[in-house]
Amino acid sequence: FVASAGFSPLAGDGRVAVLADRSGRLRPAIWDPASGQRTDLELELPGEVDVADWWPDAQALLLVHTYMGRDELSRLDLRSGALERLEHPAGSIQRAGVRPDGAVWYRLSSGAAAPEVRAVGAEEAVLRPPGPRAPAGVAYESWSFTNSEGDQVHGFLAVPPGAGPHPTVLLVHGGPHHHDADAWDPEVQAFVDHGYAVGLVNYRGSTGYGKAWQDVLEGDPGRPEIEDVVAGRDDLIARGLADPTEVVITGASWGGYVTLQAIGTVPEGWRAAMAVVPVADYLSAYADESEALQAFDRSLFGGGPEDRHDLYVERSPITHVDRVATPVLLMVGDNDTRCPLQQVLNYAERLRELGKPFELDRFDAGHGALVVNERIRQMEVLLRFAARHVPGGAEPEA
């Protein structure tokens, strides 16, 4: 992987900051297209490093170091190689930049606090969204456990007040090349407000933990993720945090795929499952999805269905639907080109034929909704479905 991270701001200076992962982790370099010279920037940092901006004099870079789901800002002097950590609250940095006067502004959020624009060295935010501020959320706790292959898997927990065990939601991120960070997520806080502990698992295939971790899924999708999510569930039960009779699995997009694949291949131990815009029937999804997604699937599976037919069938949730032993909510957009409607309807029809309890919620949009009222409605649907099947979960207010 190689990508541009921004040209030098000085007129006549053709240098470009670039990013590459050939070391196994994302690292910056400086490239001069005129001379062809490339200088890798040696950094003693354990995580992934991105370039947010140049200083106006082009003598330093503003770096974002991502490690274990949290971000740190640093100033790298390109002349001396000195790395200066910039002080700021813990959390995730969505954007950062250096202003003409040298001030560093950044957009920060955490599990406990909604996004705001802050300046390094300032006590208060410099910009906030208009209107009332979001109420403070429950802070995330860093969480690690061992999977079935002996790997350390990292994630986060958001836990309601009071002693456990709690009804628990495993909220599986999409992507699959994405990761859950210590960042503001109203969905997590909504579940916590209704009495659930929430586990966020950065399964094998997630970004943020190095190239080897991210590439595990190549040629083997739909197995490592499920193993890691199940190991996370079992760890929370062993800790006494999760009630073993009240565990819900949910996720959107690839998280919805993991949800359906988990309840079909590891059917025991789930009280309910909620799959939002999921892949449910892989052969049908491949036929109907956009060309860009077909290319992604070919890279993930090692070929198309004509090349790896048996693998597509084995890693398709509809293949295992007869083993499903928990109520299922399917939520799907009528105009979704990433996880198309028909393949979810195929899965729903198989559930109906088998007499399995399920609900189907269709909405007039694509791969998710951007309209605020629709997103609120969807969250209410999820909470009401969970409450109907999990005795310890609270119903949302009317």
PLM features per residue range, with description:
Residues F1-A3, R25-L26, E48-V49, R70-D71, ...:
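Flexible loop/turn segments at secondary-structure boundaries
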Residues F1-L19, R25-P28, E42-V64, A90-R107, ...:
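Conserved beta-propeller blade repeats
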Residues G14-D40, Q59-A60, Y67-R85, S109-L127:
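Beta-propeller blade-edge and WD-like acidic-aromatic loop motif
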Residues A20, H65, L108, G121, ...:
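Residues that line or immediately flank small-molecule/substrate-binding pockets and catalytic motifs
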Residues V64, R70-D71, L83-P161, A183-Q189, ...:
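Non-catalytic accessory segments flanking enzyme active sites
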Residues P132-T245, A252-S253, A287-A295:
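Cap/lid segment of the alpha/beta-hydrolase catalytic domain
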Residues Y203-A398:
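Active-site-proximal cap/loop segments of hydrolase catalytic domains
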